[in-house]
């Protein structure tokens, strides 16, 4: 499966830095605003493994479902590694300018609407630059792709820590009712 993934993947990323005020219409929801507290600007990021991975997943699913599940899991890890590498490059660039980044915060996290996905792709010119689009239902295509917003500040920032204390579902969470967490 790893060989298939390596042959099919064409990892690409695009990022744009923007003043927070300039992209405020796309920062909808309390969770993203909390995440960006203390940040005067943002970096928009999109990463994809490319359409070749989608084709490999379709082919695997048609012939061997167990293999397709393994390939899908490997591709999920690979796109996160691609995003991690892009984020580290951005961190290094910002550090040279005396700036610091929060972690990634993606559409669909907390109350940050997934519908923002299409706007982020447009702002990044992602369809042209890396071949990344979204369906009318705001799902990314190719599937193994990530979009995110990172905050930029002149001092170390961490954003709001993920976890039960900051979760919008805290009061009705099925995990918490069972004494567990999703962390």
Regions found by a protein language model. Give the residues of each.
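Residue-level preference for alpha-helix termini and adjacent loops
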Residues: 35, 48, 70-73, 104, ...
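Compositionally biased, low-complexity/repeat regions
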Residues: 1-30, 95-183
């Amino acid at each position: 499966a790893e060989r298939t993934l390596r042959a099919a993947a064409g990892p690409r990323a695009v990022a744009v830095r923007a003043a927070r005020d300039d992209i405020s219409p796309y920062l909808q929801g309390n969770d993203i605003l909390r995440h960006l507290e203390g940040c005067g600007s943002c970096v928009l990021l999109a990463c994809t493994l490319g359409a070749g991975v989608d084709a490999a997943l379709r082919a695997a699913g048609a012939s061997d479902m167990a293999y397709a599940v393994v390939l899908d899991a490997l591709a999920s890890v690979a796109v996160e590694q691609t995003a991690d590498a892009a984020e580290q490059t951005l961190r290094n660039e910002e550090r040279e300018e005396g700036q610091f980044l929060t972690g990634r915060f993606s559409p669909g996290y907390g109350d940050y609407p997934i519908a923002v996905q299409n706007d982020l792709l447009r702002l990044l010119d992602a369809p042209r630059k890396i071949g990344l689009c979204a369906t009318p239902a705001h799902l990314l295509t190719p599937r193994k792709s990530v979009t995110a917003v990172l905050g930029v500040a002149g001092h170390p920032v961490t954003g709001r820590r993920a976890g039960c204390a900051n979760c919008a579902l805290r009061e009705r969470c099925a995990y918490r009712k069972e004494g567990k967490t999703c962390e």
